[in-house]
A protein has these predicted regions:
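Extended catalytic cores of very large enzyme megasubunits
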Residues: 1-126
């Protein structure tokens, strides 16, 4: 049985894993696993977070990028998907409530529910 080796993403051990990456996570600016790893660490921990200080030093970010690139640590799919994208919905659980038992509040709850669901979030209603 031949061993799979990709020229573009040598980290992947099977064509199936590379196909999943290409179908679900690859996009402009993150065409390879290595690019996605670097952008993800910058987005979440680095200086790409507008108006906020980096959560990690450059050395720590470099080490984390290396771990992700080598598949020693793989972040959740939601983080992989949103890396480098304009809109990011890392947290996707919402708890909603109707404040008063009125038509208006129930209509507002419906609107909030639809808005949450359109971002791919899950909802709970208290």
């Amino acid at each position: 049985m031949a061993t799979f080796k990709s020229n573009r993403n040598p980290e992947f051990r099977s064509k199936f894993s590379e196909d999943i990456f290409n179908l679900k996570y690859s996009h402009a600016g993150c065409d390879t696993w290595q690019q996605l790893s670097s952008v993800l660490v910058q987005d979440v921990c680095g200086d790409l977070r507008e108006g906020e200080e980096s959560l990690m030093t450059k050395d720590e970010m470099s080490q984390l990028t290396k771990y992700i690139t080598e598949l020693k640590f793989v972040p959740g799919g939601r983080y992989l998907y949103y890396a480098g994208r304009k809109n990011r919905y890392y947290n996707n659980c919402f708890l909603l409530a109707a404040e008063d038992d009125t038509r208006e509040d129930w209509a507002n709850l419906s609107w909030k529910s639809e808005s949450c669901l359109m971002t791919g979030g899950g909802i709970g209603v208290d």
